[in-house]
Amino acid sequence: MLACLTRGNLLDVLQEGFNEQQLQAYVAWVNAQLKKRPAVKPVQDLRQDLRDGVILAYLIEIVAGEKLSGVQLSPGNQQEMKNNVEKVLQFVASKKIRMHQTSAKDIVDGNLKSIMRLVLALAAHFKPGSSRTVNQGRDSRAPLQSHRPHCATAVAQGAAAALADVCHDMSRSGRDVFRYRQRNSSMDEEIENPYWSVRALVQQYEGQQRSPSESSCSSLTSPSPIHSAKSESIITQSEEKADFVIIPAEGIENRTEGTDSPLSRDWRPGSPGTYLETSWEEQLLEQQEYLEKEMEEAKKMISGLQALLLNGSLPEDEQERPLALCEPGVNPEEQLIIIQSRLDQSMEENQDLKKELLKCKQEARNLQGIKDALQQRLTQQDTSVLQLKQELLRANMDKDELHNQNVDLQRKLDERNRLLGEYKKELGQKDRLLQQHQAKLEEALRKLSDVSYHQVDLERELEHKDVLLAHCMKREADEATNYNSHNSQSNGFLLPTAGKGATSVSNRGTSDLQLVRDALRSLRNSFSGHDPQHHTIDSLEQGISSLMERLHVMETQKKQERKVRVKSPRTQVGSEYRESWPPNSKLPHSQSSPTVSSTCTKVLYFTDRSLTPFMVNIPKRLEEVTLKDFKAAIDREGNHRYHFKALDPEFGTVKEEIFHDDDAIPGWEGKIVAWVEEDHGEN
């Protein structure tokens, strides 16, 4: 970088403690580069001329050989100026140029420190070859230095002077820490080893041995290394006022960032606050730490001086041959003092080695503790990993179980869907069957309505027959009257004309009854075997049978009245009517026994082979008749089922089936109505 910065003025840049000479040096270097572009005006003020970014873009184009694109050569507002500076900073970042953190806003606002940092970074990165190093400057100015000491006494006196100068600097550091740090930083930039002054003395001593022609010993005129360094720095500054010396950027960064002083830490970019803003307590603590560090360095310097005085070399330098305890021609008291000093030096070194050993042991214990802690932490982490693996295994097992459950549920869902489809099909079939049955029911209702109409016709015909029967009975009464009046003339027989009329009436009644039976048979065949309309047909058939029975009873009574007087030819009609009843009954039927006593029970039963009911009389009271008596009365072979008409208090008229022979048979209106069906063993 610039020569003024290489001799301790970098802290001035960091602290903005600029002087006019430094600013002019920066301006001169920038103008020297801009002379390569005659069209560009030279720079007068760094704050004003570089804040728009145009001069910086020209400077990059000159020193780097690359032209920045998108730069506004005549920015009209702050935003365009900021954009130009941001492009410059982006170029610096893309080239990986080492520079303290700088923002575009600082440069646009005219922050001189940020501008000088940027110029410093560009000069250090792109113009390192044109500079002269500090060491070369020293070599060129070597003849200007003072003469070297020529004996060990002069070396000791020079070391004492250097030690006194260091103590004086340390005493001044407590009063003015900033000035001391500036001096210390200027010295550290040249020589970084704490034994730099001692090494300078050793080099002078060795130079004296290499040049034996210089034999004079002058201790009072030999300057201290510190003053020599100071004078050298002053000479360097005076020589380089008109020239610019660029050093590598790595050295600048190492000196500015690698320093351990609190001042450099306070002024590091990005810190929360500056050194001037810290409280006085923190300043005192920092000064105390810094003084302790300086004391340690002073102790090391004293030890090095003592070793130099006693052994003729530094402690860290390797000695090829051991030194003798006593030198010839030396006073014994001086030898004793030297030996005592060596013993003290050895004891001091022994104490230092012990301290180093204790420190190493403490570090070893700390490392062992850290190792144990890390081992314990590793064990805990292994345990945690095992637990996580177990949890992962359990999670995988749960996942597999859930997957299996999902598969089972999916299978059940498919089965349910299949059953649902089958149920839908069955429901559709049942709907079709229901529609068919509904159609059949409508057809049956239509037929039933026809039957009801036919029944009405039959009832009308029956009423007509009743009228005819009444008319016939009236005629019979008239004939009986005529018979009584002509009994002597007819000799107990009716007139032939009367007999012919009765016969015609009986034949007509038989034909009407046969017509009713045929109609009921055809109506029964139109229904299925378990149709509920059979009950209606049975009731109708029972009513007709009861009506015929009453007619038969009336006819029988009339015949009994006439039997005493004359045998009427109309008995032949009655015998023809009785032929429809079963002749194989053991008990006398109602047709063969005209008079039924109160001890007999009339039984009317139907069979599945004939639509015409059968009637028998059982010589027992109604409540005493059992199933065994009924079976003996009808006398039918094979297995049969017996149903009897009964009155249920809840459902009304029902058919009750009797199984046991000893069970009593229910009655219906003073008689027994039964249905006998053959049992084929299906149920």
UniProtKB/Swiss-Prot annotation:
<feature type="coiled-coil region">
    <location>
        <begin position="279"/>
        <end position="452"/>
    </location>
</feature>
<dbReference type="GO" id="GO:0021869">
    <property type="term" value="P:forebrain ventricular zone progenitor cell division"/>
</dbReference>
<feature type="modified residue" description="Phosphoserine">
    <location>
        <position position="186"/>
    </location>
</feature>
<keyword id="KW-0206">Cytoskeleton</keyword>
<comment type="similarity">
    <text>Belongs to the DIXDC1 family.</text>
</comment>
<keyword id="KW-0449">Lipoprotein</keyword>
<dbReference type="GO" id="GO:0060070">
    <property type="term" value="P:canonical Wnt signaling pathway"/>
</dbReference>
<keyword id="KW-0965">Cell junction</keyword>
<dbReference type="GO" id="GO:0021799">
    <property type="term" value="P:cerebral cortex radially oriented cell migration"/>
</dbReference>
<feature type="region of interest" description="Disordered">
    <location>
        <begin position="556"/>
        <end position="594"/>
    </location>
</feature>
<comment type="subunit">
    <text>Isoform 1 but not isoform 2 binds filamentous actin. Interacts with the complex composed of DVL2 and Rac. Interacts with AXIN1; competes with MAP3K1. Interacts with MAP3K4 preventing MAP3K4 interaction with AXIN1. Directly interacts (via DIX domain) with DVL2 (via DIX domain). Interacts with gamma-tubulin.</text>
</comment>
<feature type="region of interest" description="Actin-binding">
    <location>
        <begin position="127"/>
        <end position="300"/>
    </location>
</feature>
<dbReference type="Pfam" id="PF00307">
    <property type="entry name" value="CH"/>
</dbReference>
<dbReference type="GO" id="GO:0098794">
    <property type="term" value="C:postsynapse"/>
</dbReference>
<dbReference type="GO" id="GO:0070507">
    <property type="term" value="P:regulation of microtubule cytoskeleton organization"/>
</dbReference>
<keyword id="KW-0009">Actin-binding</keyword>
<dbReference type="Pfam" id="PF00778">
    <property type="entry name" value="DIX"/>
</dbReference>
<dbReference type="InterPro" id="IPR015506">
    <property type="entry name" value="Dsh/Dvl-rel"/>
</dbReference>
<feature type="domain" description="DIX">
    <location>
        <begin position="600"/>
        <end position="680"/>
    </location>
</feature>
<dbReference type="InterPro" id="IPR038207">
    <property type="entry name" value="DIX_dom_sf"/>
</dbReference>
<dbReference type="GO" id="GO:0030177">
    <property type="term" value="P:positive regulation of Wnt signaling pathway"/>
</dbReference>
<keyword id="KW-0597">Phosphoprotein</keyword>
<dbReference type="InterPro" id="IPR029071">
    <property type="entry name" value="Ubiquitin-like_domsf"/>
</dbReference>
<protein>
    <recommendedName>
        <fullName>Dixin</fullName>
    </recommendedName>
</protein>
<feature type="region of interest" description="Disordered">
    <location>
        <begin position="207"/>
        <end position="235"/>
    </location>
</feature>
<keyword id="KW-0963">Cytoplasm</keyword>
<dbReference type="InterPro" id="IPR001715">
    <property type="entry name" value="CH_dom"/>
</dbReference>
<dbReference type="InterPro" id="IPR001158">
    <property type="entry name" value="DIX"/>
</dbReference>
<dbReference type="GO" id="GO:0019904">
    <property type="term" value="F:protein domain specific binding"/>
</dbReference>
<feature type="modified residue" description="Phosphoserine">
    <location>
        <position position="231"/>
    </location>
</feature>
<dbReference type="GO" id="GO:0005829">
    <property type="term" value="C:cytosol"/>
</dbReference>
<keyword id="KW-0519">Myristate</keyword>
<dbReference type="GO" id="GO:0043015">
    <property type="term" value="F:gamma-tubulin binding"/>
</dbReference>
<comment type="function">
    <text>Positive effector of the Wnt signaling pathway; activates WNT3A signaling via DVL2. Regulates JNK activation by AXIN1 and DVL2.</text>
</comment>
<keyword id="KW-0832">Ubl conjugation</keyword>
<dbReference type="GO" id="GO:0045665">
    <property type="term" value="P:negative regulation of neuron differentiation"/>
</dbReference>
<feature type="compositionally biased region" description="Polar residues">
    <location>
        <begin position="482"/>
        <end position="492"/>
    </location>
</feature>
<keyword id="KW-0217">Developmental protein</keyword>
<feature type="region of interest" description="Disordered">
    <location>
        <begin position="482"/>
        <end position="509"/>
    </location>
</feature>
<feature type="compositionally biased region" description="Low complexity">
    <location>
        <begin position="211"/>
        <end position="228"/>
    </location>
</feature>
<dbReference type="GO" id="GO:0098978">
    <property type="term" value="C:glutamatergic synapse"/>
</dbReference>
<dbReference type="GO" id="GO:0098885">
    <property type="term" value="P:modification of postsynaptic actin cytoskeleton"/>
</dbReference>
